[in-house]
């Protein structure tokens, strides 16, 4: 069995950057965001169920899911949101487990933005948290998504607090510094995980 390192962090913390640095070492990356898109591709159980529930006008002309329409449909509709989560979460989990079983690197990285919030660290052997100051999160997310600081603060309020996330971590990587520092930290953790991977 491959050792699974869970990777998480708040919005704008640099999870993707950190994951890509591990990927440079040939480590298999399993990304929950990518899987969440895959389980609603055309002709999947997920998309078929959404169409059955909400009708064909939830699709774009090319037959793919109209994500903004879906977002609007579930906005302030808690029952519908719960139904959607009940449909998609098991599909995402099943695909994550399937991808983990196919991993060939000494350990693999399971990247889940809301890992602590959804208690998905139970799927991992260790949890690595990318930690960053809130002011940095706001600046980065504003620059990346072109949104107002208030919008970013709302997202931060909906996520686990920095303290809760860090308390759940086995390893914490700070991403307030420069890219050279981050590369060095990833290199150290990679060596540590390679040594630990022999235990699994």
From Swiss-Prot:
Localization in the cell: Cytoplasm
Q: Which family does it belong to?
A: Belongs to the CoaE family.
- NCBIfam families in the record: dephospho-CoA kinase
Alphabetized InterPro entries for the sequence? Depp_CoAkinase (IPR001977), P-loop_NTPase (IPR027417)
Question: Which residues bind ATP per the record?
Answer: 12-17
Q: Which residues form the DPCK domain?
A: 4-200
Q: Name one GO biological process term.
A: coenzyme A biosynthetic process
Name the HAMAP family for this protein: Dephospho_CoA_kinase
- Pull one GO CC term from this UniProt entry: cytoplasm
- EC number, as in UniProt: 2.7.1.24
Known pathway: Cofactor biosynthesis; coenzyme A biosynthesis; CoA from (R)-pantothenate: step 5/5
Q: What does this protein do?
A: Catalyzes the phosphorylation of the 3'-hydroxyl group of dephosphocoenzyme A to form coenzyme A.
| Main localization, broad class | cytoplasm
- Name the UniProt record assigns to this protein: Dephospho-CoA kinase
Q: Where are the transmembrane segments?
A: none
């Amino acid at each position: 069995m491959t050792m699974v390192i869970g990777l998480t962090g708040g919005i704008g913390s640099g999870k993707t950057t950190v994951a890509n640095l591990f990927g440079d070492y040939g480590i298999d990356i399993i990304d929950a965001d990518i899987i969440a898109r895959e389980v609603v591709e055309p002709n999947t159980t997920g998309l078929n169920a959404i169409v059955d529930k909400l009708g064909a006008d939830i699709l774009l002309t090319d037959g793919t899911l109209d994500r903004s329409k879906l977002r609007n449909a579930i906005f302030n509709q808690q029952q519908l949101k719960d139904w959607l989560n009940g449909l998609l979460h098991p599909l995402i989990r099943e695909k994550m487990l399937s991808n983990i079983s196919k991993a060939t690197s000494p350990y693999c990285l399971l990247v889940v933005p809301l890992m602590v919030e959804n208690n998905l660290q139970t799927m991992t052997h260790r949890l690595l948290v990318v930690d960053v100051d809130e002011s940095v999160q706001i600046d980065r997310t504003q620059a990346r998504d072109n949104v107002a600081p208030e919008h970013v603060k709302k997202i931060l309020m909906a996520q686990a607090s920095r303290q809760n996330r860090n308390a759940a971590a086995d390893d914490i990587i700070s991403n307030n510094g420069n890219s050279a520092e981050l590369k060095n930290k990833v290199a150290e953790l990679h060596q540590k995980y390679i040594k630990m991977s022999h235990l699994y």
